[in-house]
Amino acid sequence: MVLQLCKYVPYYEQGGVLIEVSPMLRVPRTFRTFSAMMAQCLTKLKVRAATGSATLLNVVKNPLRDHLPLGIKLIGTSSKAALKPMSEYVAQFSPQGTPEHFKSICYVIGAVSVGNPGMENDFEIDESICIASQGLSAACVCSKVCMAYEQHWGIL
């Protein structure tokens, strides 16, 4: 069984631009290369891979809900929302404990450890949660979310 957990990765920029990020994208290590890539995306509306014709970044029309499956639940992360342990929170979306019974959800994660991206955006969030009592980086939040699903499904 092949289960694709990462089907769609949108990036919502502060200026209101919605960018589709391919899961195949390897983010550049230096800021200079990253800023050149983002500038190319915003001017040419897409960034293609150097080898092949795969599109790595693509500017898409707003709103975000138009690009997500029907019935998907949007969950925002915020430091001001109710604190919920991820292990208990994840269990409600996959009650049988297997990926086959998984409900479609989308997490809205901010790129900085301060602020409330789950509450400060232009699209409607179904629920906001706080997964730690202190501010976390986006990488740490993504890691905590993935680890919670791995533990719930018994992936070692």
How should these model regions be labeled?
Residues 31-34, 93, 102, 123:
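Phenylalanine-focused residue identity feature
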Residues 68-69, 99-102, 121-123:
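Intrinsically disordered, low-complexity regulatory regions enriched in Ser/Pro/Gly/Thr
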